[in-house]
Amino acid sequence: MLRQLRLTMDISGWIFLPWRRSMSNMKDSPPPPPPLASTFNDVIVDYEDPDYLPLPEYPVRPNEPLETRKQRLLYQSRKRGMLENDLLLSTFAAKHLQNFSAEQTAQYDQLINGVSNDWDIYYWATEVKPTPKEYDTEIMGLLKEHVKNAERVTRLRQPDLNI
């Protein structure tokens, strides 16, 4: 509550700043109140190079059992944060993930978790942009075929989970 009040006071100070300036020209007016500490300064991160923002590395899980990895990848395929990839990757995972070998599962893990931007995965899968060599794997080929939808399957929602 206090944080919201401070933010409201800061914003109202910006709105009424021109009025305060005109009032400050008057001799008998009281001085303006001191500005409150801005809450926006609390969240600003200042890097020396503004064009470079470090992205966290995806943690490699070398000792993760294959079945656990497949369950995690199924979840991550369904919860991408963008509907287009949610539909494409969840239907792809439901169709192919259980039949993947350990190597194919590792390739799929690298594909969906190694890329920092989900739009890249979408553009590569739909062949709008060329796929970089490190992601142009057997799994990406399967995903591209899946996206072409030669079977003309309606994909308006994610497939049900088989629990």
From Swiss-Prot:
Compartments, record wording: Mitochondrion matrix
Gene Ontology terms, MF aspect: copper ion binding
Entry keyword annotation includes Mitochondrion: yes
UniProt-listed InterPro entries: SDH, SDH_sf, SDHAF2
GO CC terms, sorted: mitochondrial matrix; mitochondrion
Family: Belongs to the SDHAF2 family.
HAMAP family in UniProt: SDHAF2 (MF_03057)
The protein's name in its UniProt record: Succinate dehydrogenase assembly factor 2-A, mitochondrial
Organism of origin: Drosophila melanogaster (Fruit fly)
